[in-house]
Amino acid sequence: MLGVCYYPEHWPRERWSEDARRMRELGLAYVRVGEFAWALLEPEPGRLDWAWLDEAVAVLAQAGLKVVLGTPTATPPKWLVDRYPEILPVDREGRRRRFGGRRHYCFSSPVYHEETRRIVTLLGERYGKHPAVAGFQTDNEYGCHGTVRCYCERCQDAFRKWLEERYGSIDVLNEAWGTVFWSQRYRTFQEVELPNLTVAEANPSHLLDYYRFASEQVRRYNRLQVEILRAHAPGKFVTHNFMGFFTDLNPFPLGEDLDFASWDSYPLGFTDLMPLPEEEKLRYARTGHPDVAAFHHDLYRAVGRGRFWVMEQQPGPVNWAPHNPNPAPGMVRLWTWEALANGAEVVSYFRWRQVPFAQEQMHAGLHRPDYAPDAAFFEVQRVVEELGALSLPPPGQAPVALVYDPEAPWVYEVQPHGAEWNYLALVFLFYSVARRLGLDVDIVPPGAALQGYRLVLVPSLPIVREKALNAFREADGIVLFGPRSGSKNENFHIPQGLPPGPLQALLPLKVVRVESLPPGLREEVEGPWGRFSSGLWREWVETDLSPLLRFADGLGALFRAGRYLYLAAWPSPELLGALLVGLAQEGGLSPKPLPSGLRLRWRGHLVFAFNYGPEEVVLPVPSGVRFRLGGPRLSPYEVAVWEEG
């Protein structure tokens, strides 16, 4: 099903009925409203104005549309900030942020918690049983604009309480943090400050705990809203719209409190911000990298425990990236179909109409500011027609699992040990190489059940907890661990028995030395799959295992013990591709290298093909297959669907 984000408060009331009618005629089903409207709902303290929202919901309902109502807490009004200036967050440099944008509040503010409780309760009481309201979105894009981590006095107080609950005694904290180093020892929890503005780098254990605390504060705040909505809106769903390539927040605990996850898909903006080779950025500037959207579909499907929406789908040029090109013709349709192929229940476009004023006036919509349909409108029309002729079976489990660790970016941000070390880049490399081989991938958190997967990819898992170790033990497929796995314990220490720490129960080896390399310095790696290169990171390993790959100096780069493998370097795409081909074949899969812009996705008995490239491609299908969409020759930016077997 399809939907759209709509801001009735931006347009004359006499326009609302026409907009709603056209939404329904287009074939849309859901409309998100209200997530930035606090100042209109409560223009003065305690004076509520529901009339405009009542009317907007009624107009949409009359057209047969279902409403997703956003709680308006991402934008506290000016009067609230003036009354309680302490709700404003403080940045890492100790500067208090000001009113005038959005997300201008601290997650630890008791006052803001109470104001949130009040406005969300009022919203739930008024609309929780409204027949046209299908569900609620809490807030909007938690953490956007660097707002997960605040450094105000309330955060300091809350962090001290969090530490006391976690450690129990200050002596335990001192031991866990290694405060004997640099004379950092604390006598009480009240002496612990936030880990910013230090002269030299802060203690890494201190930093990691603060990042954990800050993420948990977001969950605590979100849970406050969810519990209110559950009480006042029985039977209505509750979701939140997460972001792409955003690592300050661990989304999995939040997902446990939601009915399903949502995320905001902007493939062109994300591609422009990614650390990609320049030629790749240019090749995919108008389409997005072929794996950017799919990666997040798979991630947030896992966060939503099998269910997710795309709450905001890019419809044209955005306004916030360094460069904002126009999507190639057909890409809005392709992105929509790709989301559905990956299991999205709803794809909702942002926004119905481009707004002619304020911060997002250069962000395209399905309509131009002069009310005329924009290019994406006609692509959505085509999707609606195609959806009417194609029944989508339930998604199934992929043959490959990729373990994504939300704490790993924090660990490597605290102590990267190499300027180019980037956890997301390594994870994306593993994901993308697997997809280039025509393999479907499920993203799972550490500790998730791994039964049924033929191949499990663990690009890097710095902290290996018992639950994750047990899941690896119980996996019935081949498991490949990447560099720096098991390199730290829970407290950010090097494991007593050296890395890979607990993984030594599966792989009898020790990492005794590591190095980070500048981008131009490469290491040759050779083995049964050929000669390749690695870079950025290398490890020295002590073991009685015979290496499957060796560096040029003869030392091992890849080791295997039974179903488990350990890769002691950051691989090139060619090296990783050759390795995954061999492991996938051993696992009973049939990897097939695809043309550079082509990607496949299975949904039940249907196979979807997406051509992100500027060249026509011939699809890898046997003769006689039944195509439900397209055909065996796929033009640039086109979609094909066929039935398998």
UniProtKB/Swiss-Prot annotation:
Reactions this protein catalyses: Hydrolysis of terminal non-reducing beta-D-galactose residues in beta-D-galactosides
Active site as annotated: E141 (proton donor), E312 (nucleophile)
GO MF annotation list: beta-galactosidase activity; metal ion binding
Zinc recorded as keyword: yes
Binding positions (substrate): R102, N140, W320, E360, Q361, M362, H363
Protein residues bound to Zn(2+): C106, C150, C152, C155
Annotated SUPFAM superfamilies: (Trans)glycosidases, Class I glutamine amidotransferase-like, Glycosyl hydrolase domain
Keywords: Glycosidase, Hydrolase, Metal-binding, Zinc
EC number: 3.2.1.23
Highest taxon above the source species: Bacteria
One Pfam family recorded for the sequence: Glyco_hydro_42
Keyword Zinc included in the entry's annotation: yes
A single Gene Ontology CC term: beta-galactosidase complex
InterPro entries associated with the record: Beta_galactosidase_C (IPR013739), Beta_galactosidase_Trimer (IPR013738), Class_I_gatase-like (IPR029062), Glyco_hydro_42 (IPR003476), Glyco_hydro_42_N (IPR013529), Glyco_hydro_b (IPR013780), Glycoside_hydrolase_SF (IPR017853)
GO biological process: galactose metabolic process
Family from the record: Belongs to the glycosyl hydrolase 42 family.
Function: Hydrolyzes pNP-beta-galactoside. Also possesses activity against galactose, and to a lesser extent towards melibiose and lactose.
Name of the protein in its database record: Beta-galactosidase BgaT
